[in-house]
């Protein structure tokens, strides 16, 4: 009990707050339940930890665009979504972000956190229950999605999974063609 860190999955060693991304999440969720943790939190081997000094990782991973990518190309555990740092995260075709994009994404992500903070009694699972999301949290995610869709090249907020997939694969084709 004096040294609980000795039993943790080695990986992220940090003395600053970090973002936790679940390895497996329900396929029924509209958003990936991503969370910020303090350095003294020990995450299990079922959570990916990532440093996120400016809130960009949180915002991107919390968007509809990202979970659409994850649902489309990511792995599965039974029928649930399975996050992978290599396929899901590293393959995500995020364009180069301007300073303005970064600031807007960070602010939109902060709005999501503030909406969650209105109900501190709720767990992440309760916040993201498919039929039980608080309207304020839904609105915050809508704002994040509007920003993320614009960054990905949408002329307006995407309304369907198919619209997002078309953008994602166009961006992916563009990025992989440029690297040759």
Segments (PLM) and residue ranges:
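Polybasic, glycine- and aromatic-enriched phosphate-binding surface used to engage nucleic acids
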Residues: 1-107, 111, 173-180
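Non-catalytic DNA-recognition/assembly elements of restriction-modification systems
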Residues: 94-180
């Amino acid at each position: 009990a004096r040294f609980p860190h000795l039993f943790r999955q080695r990986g992220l060693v940090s003395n600053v707050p970090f973002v936790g991304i679940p390895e497996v999440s329900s396929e029924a969720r509209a958003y990936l339940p991503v969370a910020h943790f303090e350095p003294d939190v020990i995450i299990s081997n079922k959570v990916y930890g990532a440093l996120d000094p400016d809130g960009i990782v949180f915002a991107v991973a919390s968007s509809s665009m990202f979970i659409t990518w994850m649902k489309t190309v990511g792995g599965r555990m039974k029928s649930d979504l399975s996050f992978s740092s290599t396929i899901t995260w590293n393959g995500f075709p995020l364009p180069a972000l301007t300073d303005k994009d970064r600031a807007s994404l960070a602010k939109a992500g902060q709005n999501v956190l503030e909406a969650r903070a209105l109900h501190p009694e709720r767990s992440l699972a309760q916040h993201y229950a498919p039929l039980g999301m608080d309207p304020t949290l839904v609105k915050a995610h809508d704002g994040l999605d509007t920003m993320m869709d614009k960054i990905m090249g949408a002329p307006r907020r995407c309304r369907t999974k198919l619209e997002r997939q078309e953008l994602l694969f166009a961006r992916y084709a563009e990025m992989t063609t440029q690297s040759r």
